[in-house]
Each structure stands twice: as C-alpha cells, then as structure tokens.
C-alpha cells in the first residue's frame, strides 16, 4: 500500500518466507526504497538438508490445525519433551542432530534465561515454527537474485545467524 521510493531503508526480518511466494515478495520490497537507500532481508536459509528438519516432516499436519488446538498440542508435547530435550540438546555433537530432528525449539544455548523462561520460550517458538501456512526457506542465490531483480546492487551477506543480505538501491 506504500507509494514507490518513499523510504530510505526497507527491511524484513524473518517474515518473507511466510508469504505464498517468498522470492517475489523479496523482489518487490525494493520498490518502496529511494535510490541510494538500503534493503536488508533475513530469511530462513535453505540448504540441501533443510527439508529433512523435524519441523518440516510434521508441518503438513500442524499448519492445518486450528491455532487453539495446535497450541494445546504444543504445550502438551513441550511439557513432556522439554526436560528430555534439555539434556539431549546439550550432548556434544549429537545435540545438534537431536535439535535438528526433534521438532522442539532449542534454547539450551541461551544462558541468560532460567529453566522456566526457556520453557516458555520453547512453547512460544515451537508454536511459531509449526503454525504458519507458508514456510519457504531460500538459498543465498535465490534471495540475491530477487534483490537484484528489484534493483538492488552491492548485495552482501551479514555474518549473523540465518540468511541476511543487505544491498543498495541504484
């Protein structure tokens, strides 16, 4: 709904992969940015093994559930599995495998949260990862192609977690 070229910067953090066409959404964001402005986008990164992640195996079911029912399911599941995953996710090397295959968010590496805060965060983020109608991770090449198509140049990747690209509108 915005006019073209009205903002000095446009950004999206973890949203575009939840649209019906993430690549198209990424290529249209630059339209609202003035020449010389910046566009920054963060999305889930798709790697060859991404779709083997436990969440993608159950999402075909969970994304069809009513939110209230899914939240109950998540609360029950997290209540049962949280104490176990608190241990499994901490095992050197194997912890990463468990975190990848068990569709429960991993907060074991968040030292500033106590047990209850981690539990609540796991419930919230597990619901968040299982509920969206769309979840389309992108490769670096796909996101960069979308930005270039939208008129963005000097695209570079930022070192933070996830796929974070930033560039300048020409």
Give short role names for the model-derived ranges.
Residues 8-22:
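A short SAM/SAH-binding and catalytic strip from SAM-dependent methyltransferases
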Residues 23-38:
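A short glycine-rich, Lys/Arg-flanked "PGG" loop and its adjoining helix->strand segment in the class I
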Residues 110-170:
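C-terminal lobe and adjacent flexible extensions of AdoMet/dcAdoMet transferase-like proteins
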Residues 11, 44, 48-61, 115-133:
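Short, glycine-/aromatic-enriched active-site segment of Class I SAM-dependent methyltransferases
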Residues 38-85, 99, 103:
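Conserved class I S-adenosyl-L-methionine
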Residues 87-95:
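Substrate-binding clefts and catalytic carboxylate motifs of secreted carbohydrate-active enzymes
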Residues 1-9:
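A short acidic, Gly/Pro-enriched loop at the edge of an enzyme's catalytic core
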